[in-house]
Amino acid sequence: MSNLIIPKEILKTYQSLVRTFSNKINTEEKKEIKKSFETAYLAHKGIKRKSGEAYIFHPLAVAKIVAKEIGLGSLAIKCALLHDVVEDSEIKLKEIEKKFGKKAANIIDGLTKISEIIGSANSIQAENFRKMLLTLSDDVNVILIKLADRLDNMRTLGALKDQKRRKIASETLYIYAPLAHRLGLYSIKTELEDLALKYTEPEKYFEISKKLNETKTERANYIKKFLKPIKTKVKKEGFLVSIKGRPKSIFSIRKKMAKQEINFEEVFDKFAIRIITNSKELNEKSDCWKIYSIVTDYYKPNPDRLRDWISTPKTNGYESLHTTVMGPDGHWVEVQIRSERMNQIAEKGLAAHWL
């Protein structure tokens, strides 16, 4: 199969995927991934997505999410490339098992079963369905690849008809975003929610997006002003930190507006500050509290808004210290404090532990 002639654009996309894991896995695993890519390419050859592009770009995108955004290993990357092969081609599960092993075949089988259940899941309540997905799978890779699959489908949803887009977006909101949350995949959860809102409430989505854009410079200046004394003191105390200011997600702002029946201007915490300390695991808890003390020396905290997930992590593994303080000009600001290890878990979810 190594003599296979693959179009330049597809090959370029595959090479981009390889760069995300090339220094993390051995030569044998790389060969296996190449074999799974070539198998998927032949299985989907000539098939196009609704957007008109070759179907193989979808499994390539899913594999890249799995490797780069979730941080999984070679088995998951291989299965992400093959995830639609049994469902959409003549290739049988036995063939997958023979070529790629029992573990890979079980994951592909799990992914195929989930697709079948979703097709007939109209009457199943979202919460029951989420529980069923979690218990259905002996291997967490199945759920994580399914989330990556849904994320790519949401990113490319624009090519579908409006009714179909709304249906998929609603399903994403009630099933997949909470599932990502349950597994601690906060970045993926947030993106799924924002993309779902874009198709379920497009007017609200674009209104909030536009206003966030319009207030970008003002927000950046405020964050700079807020952080100035903190940065000086943190450095003086000898902490090595990275500090980021980021706007809250469009979905979370919309949720607050709806719940409190207020407009965009009245949402008091439209952004959050994240302080990540480069501490050794032995000192990370005390360092986070010391940084908390520095922040609250400058800005008065709201005691009702303190969340200590360092002493008691969330069930999905999330660890962080959250506080809301009164910043300059009487604005409330949310501050999240965590170590690099905690941040890795917050970004990659429980996958950071398991795989």
Q: Can you describe what each PLM-predicted range is?
A:
Residues 38, 64, 106-109:
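Generic alpha-helical structural context detector
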